[in-house]
Amino acid sequence: MARKGILGTKLGMTQVFDESNRVVPVTVVKAGPNVVTRIRTPERDGYSAVQLAYGEISPRKVNKPLTGQYTAAGVNPRRYLAELRLDDSDAATEYQVGQELTAEIFADGSYVDVTGTSKGKGFAGTMKRHGFRGQGASHGAQAVHRRPGSIGGCATPARVFKGTRMAGRMGNDRVTVLNLLVHKVDAENGVLLIKGAVPGRTGGLVMVRSAIKRGEK
């Protein structure tokens, strides 16, 4: 079976009750509808993938190369494009150009991997960014409480090693959370209720894919 995936929008978090009346924290994801605009094959492209398009956009805002691609696929222009990698044998049999994908491709109780862009935190110090302990709060410490301390030797090695954890921009990274449980699929509203937290801000773009390290339940 081909790996399944869909683009969607994170709508926020809420809580629901399961069959045992226990509270379950869930993230609400508006999944799709997506449309297949291109199928990559090993013979032509060197790998197998399916290209998904999602979100409304004015045709005036789409450049000519993408307009031609949408026209060839016979679909209206969309705001977002993303590729879902597949096994070599899956692309031609499971998907067709112009096919529409909705939240119903997933089932209650299945496991998914969710990819999104984490919230940007701006310029952050080492205590917030890397969890450094910091320095003394008293006993003669003067204005060094949140400083990182030494970042390297002087004469030897006379440089700062690459990868040294220092202050800098934090967040706004591509993050994937693995093996999240789909608590419920609301096919009528095109919504997935995913147990736990999902990367990114409310209103952010996410990709929901069937879990790669866990088989279908």
UniProtKB/Swiss-Prot annotation:
The entry lists its GO molecular-function terms as: rRNA binding; structural constituent of ribosome
Q: Any S-S bridges, and between which cysteines?
A: none
Looking up Gene3D superfamilies in the UniProt record yields:
3.30.160.810, Translation factors (2.40.30.10)
Q: Respond yes or no to whether keyword Ribonucleoprotein is given for this record.
A: yes
GO annotation, cellular component aspect: cytosolic large ribosomal subunit
Could you tell me which InterPro entries the record lists for this protein? Ribosomal_uL3, Ribosomal_uL3_bac/org-type, Ribosomal_uL3_CS, Transl_B-barrel_sf
Q: Sorted alphabetically, which keywords does the UniProt record give?
A: Ribonucleoprotein, Ribosomal protein, RNA-binding, rRNA-binding
Q: Which family does it belong to?
A: Belongs to the universal ribosomal protein uL3 family.
Role noted for this protein: One of the primary rRNA binding proteins, it binds directly near the 3'-end of the 23S rRNA, where it nucleates assembly of the 50S subunit.
Task: Outline the subunit composition.
Answer: Part of the 50S ribosomal subunit. Forms a cluster with proteins L14 and L19.
Put simply, this protein is called Large ribosomal subunit protein uL3
Species of origin = Mycobacterium tuberculosis (strain ATCC 25177 / H37Ra)
Q: What is the lineage of its organism?
A: Bacteria, Bacillati, Actinomycetota, Actinomycetes, Mycobacteriales
